[in-house]
Amino acid sequence: MNLCCGCFVRPLFLYERSFNMYTLKTNASFDSAHFLAGYEGKCSNIHGHHWTVEIEVGSNSLEMGGNNRGMIVDFSRLKTDLKNIADALDHCLIVEIGSLKRRTLDVLEEEHFKVVEVMFRPTAENFAKFFYEEMKQKGYHVLKATVYETPNNCAAYME
């Protein structure tokens, strides 16, 4: 042990872990358009992405009985819950509340365009936090949510 500022500090070795955990990952995708209000650059214009969302959940233990014995959760339930959230954003224009004039929104509605207003600037980073929180509200122990706006560019959120 090392003495530092009057306290004992235990050296941390890379092979030491304080817990064991099982993890599951699944993904869903959706296509949508967005723009970044107030951004100086190309992303201030309406443009689209094929978004992919990857969610990772974990547990220190597995189900001990029933249909899910030996599992954290059934993959089909995890995939369905994530897909339902992604499907609500599929083939729409995602806008930050207050970023478009009311009359613009009214015209889009009259033309039967699907517009989804969100409380955040629609960046990959904010979508990662959004999916993390939505899945957490469904009762999952979410470890990490990753959102790809292109195959090579992604943002992640974890707590």
In which residue ranges do the predicted regions lie?
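Secreted/luminal cysteine- and crosslink-motif detector
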Residues: 5-8, 44
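Charge-rich, low-complexity N-terminal segments
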Residues: 17-159
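Short, Lys/Arg-enriched N-terminal segments with co-localized hydrophobic residues
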Residues: 7-20
